[in-house]
């Protein structure tokens, strides 16, 4: 539901002539969940979805809304024609699905609105088109609908678990949905959940020989673990301003021999040979993994991020050893967060 929120509310609005967020919250939530089941989950019979939704609304204090919920959901089933193998962004009668297929609709629900068809806010879509053009923007938007797989990798001296599927890049594996993630990581602690594109950024520094390394904005420690695997003899420190993520980092730190600097403690007393700055960004390169990013990717948000990124880079340079190396990384595809930062720093 989260991933397809805007597409679902557009369809519900078309079927009901009502704005979903103005409905009583339990009624709107029921319609969203039921519509997602009708459009995206093929194994659940329509009558089961509708009966369950109506029954839930009745039992949870909204008996007067049962007729409305029933009518809207039945209208949605009548809007569907057939599932076609390949959906097309821009076809107003296509409800796109994550596997590339689409429900062909009997009415033009998404007329002139690729943004709503793919689940982007209007401001985010405007930014996407401005930066990349409508054709590429549509390709990016369609790609964001798919549910991204969980990908793992291991240090060079370890093999991937037998339970994972081979990725196109032999260093990585795709975790099947039936594998217990907790057991997987407990059995192999140095395993990392990491995409190839994220991991590959550290390939730029793997031939260096740094004595002291700092990972700023370390999050839960994914790149920190990778740094330890690359540089087993280096002193490695990490920082993370978010309390929740830093708690995970602190739990990991003893296992990989990393110092975690806290906001209320003394920082480093010596400069670093290598500083890794994987900075907060718009997540525009990972829309499929961060569905919420499609709602906030606009000029105002990008401008605030660019300012924050510049501050982090300036701080990073201030603790960098003379002739040291600074690795700047984002998971954004927006030029303002990437190449445009180079002249400033």
Which residues does each predicted region cover?
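Class I Rossmann-like S-adenosyl-L-methionine
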Residues: 1-179, 228
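Rossmann-like S-adenosyl-L-methionine
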Residues: 166-345
């Amino acid at each position: 539901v989260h991933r397809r929120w805007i597409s679902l509310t557009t369809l519900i609005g078309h079927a009901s002539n009502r704005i979903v967020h103005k409905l009583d919250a339990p009624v709107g939530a029921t319609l969203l969940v039921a519509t997602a089941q009708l459009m995206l989950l093929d194994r659940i019979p329509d009558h089961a979805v509708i009966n369950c939704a109506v029954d839930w609304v009745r039992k949870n204090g909204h008996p007067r809304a049962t007729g409305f919920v029933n009518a809207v959901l039945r209208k949605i089933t009548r809007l569907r024609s057939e599932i076609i193998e390949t959906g097309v962004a821009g076809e107003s009668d296509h409800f796109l699905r994550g596997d590339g297929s689409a429900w062909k609709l009997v009415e033009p629900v998404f007329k002139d609105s690729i943004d709503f068809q793919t689940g982007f806010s209007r401001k985010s879509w405007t930014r996407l088109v401005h930066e990349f053009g409508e054709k590429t923007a549509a390709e990016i938007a369609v790609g964001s609908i798919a549910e991204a797989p969980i990908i793992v990798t291991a240090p060079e001296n370890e093999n991937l678990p037998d339970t994972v599927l081979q990725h196109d890049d032999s260093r990585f594996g795709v975790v099947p949905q039936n594998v217990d993630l907790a057991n997987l990581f407990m059995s192999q602690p140095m395993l990392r959940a990491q995409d190839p594109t994220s991991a590959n950024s550290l390939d730029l520094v793997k031939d260096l020989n740094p004595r002291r390394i700092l990972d700023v904005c370390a999050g839960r420690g994914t790149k920190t673990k990778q740094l330890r695997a690359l540089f087993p003899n280096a002193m490695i420190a990490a920082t993370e301003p978010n309390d929740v993520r830093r708690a995970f980092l602190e739990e990991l730190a003893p296992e990989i021999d990393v110092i975690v600097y806290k906001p209320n403690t003394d920082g480093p007393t010596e400069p670093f040979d290598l500083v890794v700055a994987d900075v907060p960004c718009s997540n525009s390169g990972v829309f499929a993994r961060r569905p919420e990013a499609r709602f906030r990717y606009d000029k105002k948000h990008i401008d605030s991020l660019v300012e924050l990124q510049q501050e982090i880079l300036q701080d990073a340079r201030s603790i960098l050893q003379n002739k040291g190396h600074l690795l700047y990384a984002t998971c954004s595809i927006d030029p303002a967060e990437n190449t445009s930062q180079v002249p400033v720093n």
